[in-house]
Amino acid sequence: MAITAAQVKELRDRTGAGMMDCKKALTETNGDIELAIDNMRKSGAAKAAKKAGNIAAEGAILIKQGEGYAALLEVNCQTDFVAKDSNFLAFANEVLDVAAASKVTIEDLKAQFEETRVALVTKIGENINVRRIEYIDGANLAQYRHGERIGVVVAGEADEETLKHIAMHVAASKPEYVNPSDVPAEVVEKEKALQIEIAMNEGKPAEIAEKMVIGRMKKFTGEVSLTGQAFIMEPKKTVGDILKEKGASVTNFIRLEVGEGIERKEEDFAAEVAAQIAATNKA
């Protein structure tokens, strides 16, 4: 039977798929739209399963504040081009809205949005991954996003402007802890052993090496903690100095950056696409 433009339009509206894909699906089902949708969903799931092996290290960090807390979400794709795509961002924001409404776990988010994710993978042609969701509590919260790639929320006792500036500092300086005293003992001991070994390799006697390491460890714990770092807006002062001057404090912070911790392959996505086109041409 002949497939009409109205049928193709209806299938496109309901699935978001391309015109040629819709026409092909309708032709295969003799114009049965419901069967075409079922077949496209099955095909989409298969395509998504194949894409799942592709590394998704680009994407976006999104933030949404609720009553006394904030949610930070990372959703990944394969290229920065798709990271700016309206369909990708709409999906990410939909996930964030659900997460922020009731502090949903990452496992439940993945399960709830799996069908939508699969449909998006089919439409966009890249692997999409809802990677992580973090929550931070606090009566006073300030957030900062550096583009779509870095997101920070800071909780503390301070005015909004001060907390916003601290959030900007966290985005730039990547502290791991709030205070030097928060650095775990095992981290301190590991660094201390390393510094002693370095000092002794420099030819220093053991007792001298031990004394040298005291100063180095103070520097180390300061560099990895927020209040011990030089404040980016006033480098001659530490963040701790600034907070003390303002009678303020920071209780917690969360910093997320797109793709951190994901091992990337050397080959780029463009090369992968070229290889797929070449394989198609040979077929």
UniProtKB/Swiss-Prot annotation:
Belongs to the EF-Ts family. This is Elongation factor Ts. It comes from Shewanella halifaxensis (strain HAW-EB4). One of its GO terms (cellular component) is cytoplasm. The keyword Cytoplasm applies. PANTHER family: ELONGATION FACTOR TS, ELONGATION FACTOR TS, MITOCHONDRIAL. Residues 79-82 are annotated as: Involved in Mg(2+) ion dislocation from EF-Tu. PROSITE patterns: EF_TS_1, EF_TS_2. GO terms for molecular function: translation elongation factor activity. NCBIfam families: tsf. It is found in: Cytoplasm. It comes from the Bacteria. Associates with the EF-Tu.GDP complex and induces the exchange of GDP to GTP. It remains bound to the aminoacyl-tRNA.EF-Tu.GTP complex up to the GTP hydrolysis stage on the ribosome. Keywords: Cytoplasm, Elongation factor, Protein biosynthesis. Transmembrane segments: none annotated.
